[in-house]
A protein has these predicted regions:
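Structured beta-strand-rich core segments of catalytic domains in phosphoester-bond hydrolases
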Residues: 4-42, 87-178
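Metal-dependent phosphoesterases centered on the DNase I-like endonuclease/exonuclease/phosphatase
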Residues: 194-284
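Short aromatic-enriched loop/helix-cap "lid" or pocket-rim segments at secondary-structure transitions
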Residues: 65-67, 95-97, 123-126, 147, ...
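Catalytic metal-binding/acid-base residues of hydrolase active sites
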Residues: 58, 88, 117-118, 185-187, ...
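Active-site beta-strand/loop signature of hydrolases that rely on acidic residues for catalysis
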Residues: 50-57, 70-96, 135, 170, ...
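Stable alpha-helical elements in mature extracytoplasmic
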Residues: 62-66, 99, 103, 113, ...
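Active-site-proximal loop/helix segment associated with metal-binding centers of metalloenzymes
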Residues: 161, 179-188, 242-246
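Acidic-and-aromatic substrate-binding clefts and catalytic sites of carbohydrate-active enzymes
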Residues: 59-64, 89-94, 191-193
Length: 284
C-alpha cells in the first residue's frame, strides 16, 4: 500500500481540528483499499474441517516470536485462515516493517490488508499505517475494507491518528467453493451499544457483498462488557474477581454485538466463556 510523506500526513491530520474523520479519510484513497496478494497456490486437497485462528498481533511488535508461535503451537493445528488485527506497516515502533506482508511471506499465505489508522505522533514513521488482515492458505477471490461507524475520535487522543475502526472482508476459494472471512476490530472506547452498531455494519456488508455464501466472523471485538473511556468502571472490575466472573458468564447482556450476530443467523463460538490475556507478556 502506497505511503504518504509525513508532511502530507500531518497536513491531513491538522484538518481534523475542523473536519470529521470521515471527511478527511475520503481524501485518502488508501482507506478505501483492500491490499491483496495472491501468491500462494491452492492446496491440493480440501480438508474436512478448516482451522481458523483469531489473533491480535499487537502492532506486529515481536514479529518473529509471533511467527514462531504460529509455526510451533500444536493447539492451533490445522491452520488455514488467520483473522488478524493490529498489524503495522511502516511504523518505527515495529521496526518500520510491513508486518502483514512479512508474515504472509514467511508462511506462504495469501492475504488482504485494510488500513485502520494513520499514526501521527511519530514523524519518523516511514508510513505510519496500522490495520487488519485476513491471511489464507487458499486463494482470495475478492476483498474489501469495510469502514465502521465512528464511536470514538482517535485524533483527540494521546495516540493521535487519522482513521477509524474497520473490518477486512474477503471471499476465499476453498477448492472451488466460496467462503467469506471477516477480520473485525470493534471500538474499545465505547459501550456495548456502540459495538453493536459497528457489528451490524459488518453483518450488512457481508449480506450485501457475499449473498448466499457462508461467512466466518472474527477478530478483536473488544467485548469487554464496559466502556473503555470509563476509568472508574475499569478500576471497579479490575478490583473485583466476582464482578469479572459475572461479566464473563453473561457477556451478551453487556455486549449487544453478539446477539445481533446471532439474530442474523451466526453461531457464537465458543459457547462457553473463557478468560483471555488482553496484553502480551514482556517477552512477546
Amino acid at each position: 500500500m502506497r505511503g504518504i510523506p509525513n508532511p502530507e500526513r500531518q497536513r491531513l491530520g491538522a484538518l481534523l481540528e475542523q473536519e470529521t474523520q470521515e471527511t478527511v479519510m475520503a481524501k485518502i484513497p488508501q482507506f478505501a483499499e483492500a491490499e491483496t496478494e495472491n501468491w500462494a497456490p491452492a492446496p491440493a486437497a480440501v480438508p474436512e474441517q478448516l482451522g481458523i485462528l483469531v489473533f491480535n498481533m499487537e502492532r506486529g511488535v515481536h514479529l518473529e516470536e509471533r511467527g514462531d508461535f504460529l509455526q510451533d503451537c500444536p493447539d492451533i493445528r490445522p491452520l488455514d485462515v488467520v483473522l488478524a488485527n493490529e498489524l503495522d506497516d511502516g511504523c518505527v515502533r515495529s521496526g518500520g516493517r510491513n508486518t502483514a506482508r512479512e508474515l504472509a511471506e514467511r508462511f506462504g499465505w495469501n492475504y488482504a490488508y485494510g488500513l485502520e489508522f494513520i499514526e501521527l505522533v511519530n514523524g519518523a514513521d516511514p508510513k505510519g499505517f496500522h490495520g487488519n488482515a485476513v491471511f489464507s492458505r487458499w486463494p482470495i477471490r475478492r476483498a474489501w475494507t469495510v469502514r465502521l461507524p465512528e464511536q470514538y475520535n482517535w485524533y483527540f487522543d494521546r495516540q493521535r491518528r487519522i482513521g477509524g475502526r474497520c473490518a477486512v472482508l474477503a471471499e476465499l476459494d476453498i477448492g472451488g467453493r466460496p467462503l467469506g472471512g471477516a477480520s473485525i476490530h470493534l471500538e474499545n472506547r465505547t459501550h456495548g451499544e456502540g459495538r453493536r452498531l459497528q457489528m451490524e455494519t459488518v453483518l450488512q456488508a457481508a449480506e450485501r457483498l457475499l449473498p448466499g455464501i457462508p461467512v466466518v466472523l472474527g477478530g478483536d471485538l473488544n467485548t469487554n462488557t464496559f466502556d473503555g473511556r470509563d476509568k472508574d468502571v475499569i478500576q471497579e472490575i479490575a478490583g473485583s474477581p466476582e464482578l469479572q466472573r459475572r461479566c464473563l458468564e453473561d457477556v451478551a447482556r453487556y455486549e449487544a454485538a453478539l446477539p445481533a450476530a446471532e439474530d442474523m443467523g451466526y453461531c457464537v463460538v465458543p459457547r462457553e466463556p473463557a478468560v483471555t490475556r488482553r496484553k502480551p507478556l514482556p517477552d512477546g
